[in-house]
Every structure is written in structure tokens, then in C-alpha cells.
């Protein structure tokens, strides 16, 4: 096991890049090896004040979410867990962690449960990003975090004995039939996703450079082309319910929805599933800038699916403030940047119409 201490130096760079004040809250993450692929993360509040943050998609989340990135020979190992979108207001207590200044908490997890490490060998582990800060159960800001770089030698035989967190469903056992009001709601959401994505693709390729800079931190033609291409791919994928690269469930077939989660994606299988909150708490479309709705939530999840456009996105940040503070390279691969940009590019929505041919399997 080899540990490279980079956290303090890189956190200083992150704080500078995000233009945070010197006393801004910051989390330091120390990764250590417990046994083979079992890892412990020690998260410390190195700021001067108590902080409350959303720990979904972060350490202390019990779901098989992406807590760290794994690399073998500088190539990232595919993540086989879930990426989910959650509420940004009205959060429940079980989604929040409060940490006093100088305090720590620990989280142990097995990286082999959400990645194929059966070939063994040297694996490098690290993580960085921003975690949403919460005030009165609402996302109110962001806290940057960064870990050390941990290098471990994986015993292939031991890694092969670790149960996979997600067991793929056989198509014959899908019980979540999309019918009734939920089928109607998802059909409307997909139509709206097509319109949003097409409008966003046009804005990305030939719209205001200042506005593109606002969301993606650059105006380079290569980035504008890449963003536009992803939006076009999403519009294509969402244009039908009969076939395509993704399978879209009206309800959760895996049991990972909870009182805060709107929807999630299983990128390794190009599966998307909606949760109850998608239908009960979200409007079909919002006319409020940067607010959540069904269409941009579906769009957010489509960006995660590599079958739609590769590579799929990550969840480096949530919400406008945090997402627009990312570096250009992270913004390009952050799901919420696409949802926020699309939300701020209102198209002229067509009247309801039957979905056209061939892309998304809706079940």
C-alpha cells in the first residue's frame, strides 16, 4: 500500500479556483486500506465552523454510490454502482451530516462491490469534488473536498469473493410495468426532454458565448461541440419508448429510492429508474430558473449513461452555485451542468404528440 499526501496542496488549489474565502468550510478526506479492497475514509472538517452537508453520493451513504475513483495504469476502472439525483430542498434528516470544526467521521466500504477488480494488481484510489452544504434542509452552498492518493495491491482471488452491490435483472423478471398516470407523466417528460435537449444543443453550438462560459467555464470550440453533441444524443435517445441504448423504469426495480432521491442511473448497464418523488414532488416543467423538474431530472440521468454519449457524466457538484464553480474539465463531465444549462434554455414546447420512433425502452 502506498499513500501520497496531496490533499492539503490540492485543496489550496481548489479553494483558489472556486474563489472561496480563506475561512470557507473545507473537508479533508484520508483514504486508508483496511483489508485488500476494503477501504476506510476519514472525513475531517478542517474549517473554523460547524457545517451541515448532504451526504448522499458521498461518504456515509449506504447505497452503492461512487465515493472514490479507481485507476489501473492511469485508466479509470468502470464503476458499476448507481448515480442518483436527489432533492435540493425539503431534505430529510437522514440525508444530512453535521460536523463540528475539527471533528471527523469514518466510513468503510469495499471498492470491489462496485467495480470489477478480479484481475488484481495495482490500483490507485482518489476522490475530489464538492459536497452540497445545507441550511434549513435546503442546499445552500457547497464545500470542497479532496483526498490523498492511495495505491494498493489487489489480491485477485479475494476480490472475486466480494458480492457485487448490483445484481442485474433479467429482462423477463422486470415487474415495473409502465402504465397509467406514471406512463403518461414519463411520456410527457421525455417529450419535454427532447425539446430541452435540442434547444440546448443549438445554444451550445451557436448561442451566446458568455452564457456558455457561465455554465461550462470555457468557450473553446471543442468543448462547445462536445456539449452540443451530448445534448443531441440525449434528444435522440429520449425521442421514443420502444428501443435504443437505455432502459427506463417508471419505478425502482432495485430498491435504491428513498425519501430524498428523485431518480438514479446505473451507468454500467445504461439503466435509469424514477423514484416516487419524481412524480409527487416535481412539476413536468419548471419556469423557475435552475429549479428541478421531471424533464431536467430525466436529462440529468441520460447524461450519466455512456450508451447515450460516452463517457457518461459524474456528479462532481449539484446546483447552480457549485456546478458553475467547477473547472472547465469537471463541468464538461458534470451531470447538473447539462441540466442547468438546458433549464436556462427554454424552447418553444410543442403540443403533446405521440413519440416518434426508436430509442428509449420504457418499462
Swiss-Prot record:
It comes from the Eukaryota. It is found in: Secreted. GO terms for biological process: proteolysis. It catalyses: Preferential cleavage of bonds with hydrophobic residues in P1'. Also 3-Asn-|-Gln-4 and 8-Gly-|-Ser-9 bonds in insulin B chain. Disulfide bonds join 178-250, 257-275. The keyword Disulfide bond applies. The active site is at residue 301. GO terms for cellular component: extracellular region. Its EC number is 3.4.24.39. Binds 1 zinc ion per subunit. Transmembrane segments: none annotated. Its cofactor is Zn(2+). Keywords: Cleavage on pair of basic residues, Disulfide bond, Hydrolase, Metal-binding, Metalloprotease, Protease, Secreted, Signal, Zinc, Zymogen. One of its GO terms (molecular function) is metalloendopeptidase activity. Residues 20-172 form a propeptide. PANTHER family: NEUTRAL PROTEASE 2-RELATED (PTHR37016:SF3), PTHR37016. This is Neutral protease 2 homolog NFIA_102630.
Amino acid at each position: 500500500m502506498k499513500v501520497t499526501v496531496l490533499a492539503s496542496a490540492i485543496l489550496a488549489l481548489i479553494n483558489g479556483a472556486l474563489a472561496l474565502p480563506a475561512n470557507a468550510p473545507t473537508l479533508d478526506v484520508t483514504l486508508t486500506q483496511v483489508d485488500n479492497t476494503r477501504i476506510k475514509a476519514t472525513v475531517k472538517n478542517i474549517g473554523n465552523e460547524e457545517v451541515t452537508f448532504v451526504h448522499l453520493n458521498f461518504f456515509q451513504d449506504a447505497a452503492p454510490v461512487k465515493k472514490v475513483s479507481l485507476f489501473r495504469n492511469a485508466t479509470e476502472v468502470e464503476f458499476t454502482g448507481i448515480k442518483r439525483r436527489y432533492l435540493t430542498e425539503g431534505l430529510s434528516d437522514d440525508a444530512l451530516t453535521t460536523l463540528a470544526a475539527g471533528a471527523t467521521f469514518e466510513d468503510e466500504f469495499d471498492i470491489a462491490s462496485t467495480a470489477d477488480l478480479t484481475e488484481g494488481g495495482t490500483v490507485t484510489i482518489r476522490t475530489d469534488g464538492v459536497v452540497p452544504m445545507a441550511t434549513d434542509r435546503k442546499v445552500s452552498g457547497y464545500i470542497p473536498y479532496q483526498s490523498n492518493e492511495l495505491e494498493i495491491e489487489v489480491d485477485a482471488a479475494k476480490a472475486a469473493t466480494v458480492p457485487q452491490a448490483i445484481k442485474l435483472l433479467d429482462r423477463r423478471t422486470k415487474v415495473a410495468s409502465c402504465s397509467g398516470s406514471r406512463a403518461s407523466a414519463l411520456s410527457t417528460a421525455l417529450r419535454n426532454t427532447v425539446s430541452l435537449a435540442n434547444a440546448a444543443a443549438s445554444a451550445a453550438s451557436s448561442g451566446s458565448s458568455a452564457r456558455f462560459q457561465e455554465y461550462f467555464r470555457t468557450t473553446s470550440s471543442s468543448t462547445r461541440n462536445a456539449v452540443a453533441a451530448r445534448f443531441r444524443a440525449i434528444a435522440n435517445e429520449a425521442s421514443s419508448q420502444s428501443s435504443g441504448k437505455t432502459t427506463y423504469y417508471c419505478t425502482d426495480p432495485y430498491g435504491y429510492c428513498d425519501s430524498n432521491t428523485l431518480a438514479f442511473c446505473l451507468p454500467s448497464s445504461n439503466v435509469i429508474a424514477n423514484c416516487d418523488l419524481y412524480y409527487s414532488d416535481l412539476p413536468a416543467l419548471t419556469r423557475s430558473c435552475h429549479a428541478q423538474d421531471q424533464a431536467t431530472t430525466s436529462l440529468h440521468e441520460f447524461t450519466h449513461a455512456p450508451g447515450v454519449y460516452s463517457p457518461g457524466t459524474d456528479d462532481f457538484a449539484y446546483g447552480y452555485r457549485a456546478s458553475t464553480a467547477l473547472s472547465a474539465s469537471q463541468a464538461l463531465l458534470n451531470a447538473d451542468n447539462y441540466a442547468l444549462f438546458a433549464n436556462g434554455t427554454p424552447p418553444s414546447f410543442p403540443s403533446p404528440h405521440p413519440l416518434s420512433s426508436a430509442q428509449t425502452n420504457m418499462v
